[in-house]
Amino acid sequence: MKMPKNNVYTVSRLNGEVRQLLEGELGKVWLEAEISNFSAPSSGHWYLTLKDNYAQIRAAMFKGRNRAVTFRPANGQQVLVKGAISVYEPRGDYQLIIDSMLPAGDGLLAQQYEALKMKLAAEGLFAADTKRPLPSNIQRIGVVTSATGAAIRDVLHVLKRRDPSIEVIIYPSQVQGEHADKSLCHAIMQANDRMEVDVLLLTRGGGSLEDLWCFNSEALAHTIYNSALPVVSAVGHEVDTTISDYVADLRAPTPSAAAELLSQDALSKADKLRMTMTRLKQGWQHYGLKQAQRFSQLHHRLERQDPKRRLQQYEQRFDELQLRLGAALTGKLHQMERRQQSLHARLNQVSPSHQLALAASRLTHQNQRLHSAMQARLNSAEKSLQYAAHQLETVSPLATLSRGYSITLDTEGKVLHSAQDVRTGARLTTKLVDGEVQSTVI
């Protein structure tokens, strides 16, 4: 087989091209999944596995991104994440690099949104019979939005093209941030105080759920509901729906679409309006898709040249080695502890204290045996002594005396056995059972 000269890949080159292919084709994706194997090492990065019932994928969220997460992820938790597919080239593993993370389903913001929506609906703020019709001849449009945002530019561009005679008055307001809802309320009330326009357009461009959150304010909902001027809400993209959309008299999917609706009387026929709306929607979608693809390509080209990505890969590798080292050290410590316990047990078997304890036990046993033997000997000796005493008692002279006999002794204490052994005048001693009698031979 002939070896190709120009088509032989190295592993590094292959992994690099796979990474470029995945990142270039997929771009940013939204993913709903369950968290498992969650790890948060000292570097501050997060590593986890995202899974469903049939598959799983590794994921990483670096500390520059996870600082914005408002909750602590946990194993078993359902989340909604946005990120880009990437390849960790040293291992050839593909993974998801997470940019943002939200609780899925019953997340905090989603819960607040649904609770407020139900409350306002119960109060009647969404009722169809409270919606006011738009004026038939709109001459002035008041726009409540950021004076420098993309939304006002889109609105002015559409109105200029469709009906240049319509006058636009801008009521500048914050459309994002902590106090944006108060700013929006103030702008709407200012327009109602002046009463210089025919209709109000409340609008801003697209953004995340957090970016659009000021349009979900209860105070803003009541301000729109109490407005004497009709209000059109056009917040975000077509897929975004805010509380202001429900309360307003009319909802438009985008700022440009709202401008189209408000200038509809300048068109002579409804058919032309429908055709224009269709073309506008298609053109906007095509333009948005094209711009998104172009931005994604430029973004990935920039990321490939960015040393920050390489640094993140090295940090990820360092975290992995740190975890492996920690596991190895833990295993070694457990092995040493088991070895120490074994040596301690063996040392106890040969230690002097152990040997002394054994000797003391044996000595106690021997003492008990000796005491038993001595007691047995004493008992035996006592019985022998009693027997001998009995025998002596049987042959004792005292026993003879107790039967009525006596013993006669001469002056030298010798027992007299015959009368011929004494002479006249001799002194004799006669022993009786209860005493002695002195006598003289006549």
Swiss-Prot record:
GO terms for cellular component: cytoplasm; exodeoxyribonuclease VII complex. Its EC number is 3.1.11.6. Keywords: Cytoplasm, Exonuclease, Hydrolase, Nuclease. InterPro entries: Exonuc_VII_L, Exonuc_VII_lsu_C, OB-fold_nuc-bd_dom. GO terms for molecular function: exodeoxyribonuclease VII activity; nucleic acid binding. It is an enzyme of class 3 (hydrolase). It is found in: Cytoplasm. Transmembrane segments: none annotated. Signal peptide: none annotated. One of its GO terms (biological process) is DNA catabolic process. Its main location: cytoplasm. It catalyses: Exonucleolytic cleavage in either 5'- to 3'- or 3'- to 5'-direction to yield nucleoside 5'-phosphates. Pfam families: Exonuc_VII_L, tRNA_anti_2. Heterooligomer composed of large and small subunits. Bidirectionally degrades single-stranded DNA into large acid-insoluble oligonucleotides, which are then degraded further into small acid-soluble oligonucleotides. Belongs to the XseA family. This is Exodeoxyribonuclease 7 large subunit.
